[in-house]
Amino acid sequence: MDERRTLRVSEAVREELSEIISFEMDDPRVLEAEVTEVMVSPDSRHASIKIACRGDEKKQNHAIAALEHAAGYLRRELASRLQLRHVPELHFERDKNPDVESRVDFLLRRARRTKGREENPSS
């Protein structure tokens, strides 16, 4: 697969995983997990997914473990949403970038404000 296609597939996988994790998973361990980066291998067989999660290292490790446990479900969901010949195996890891935590905080605050406006449109 050429580099541009690899980047497009990586971005599509990131968008879909973000949607599934944020809105369709019921596991409380992943409530504050955010997909920050996806790198799909050139043969499209493997995807390395970086996850940022607020909280201490123990909480982050629990979120990664929950996502690893749900990898089969997530992969099936990706298969139903994306037109790919091969849906990659998903490998989750913690994003260790210090700027990511502040970005996650910002995104969570924005999501709460948006949700509040949807529930109370007159405000």
From Swiss-Prot:
GO BP of this protein: maturation of SSU-rRNA
One cellular-component annotation, GO: cytosol
InterPro entries: KH_dom-like_a/b, RbfA, RbfA_dom_sf, Ribosome-bd_factorA_CS
Pfam families recorded: RBFA
Residues spanning the signal sequence: none
GO function term, MF aspect, one: ribosomal small subunit binding
Keyword terms of this UniProt record: Cytoplasm, Ribosome biogenesis
Major subcellular site: cytoplasm
Subcellular location: Cytoplasm
Subunit structure: Monomer. Binds 30S ribosomal subunits, but not 50S ribosomal subunits or 70S ribosomes.
Function field: One of several proteins that assist in the late maturation steps of the functional core of the 30S ribosomal subunit. Associates with free 30S ribosomal subunits (but not with 30S subunits that are part of 70S ribosomes or polysomes). Required for efficient processing of 16S rRNA. May interact with the 5'-terminal helix region of 16S rRNA.
Similarity section: Belongs to the RbfA family.
The protein's name in its UniProt record: Ribosome-binding factor A
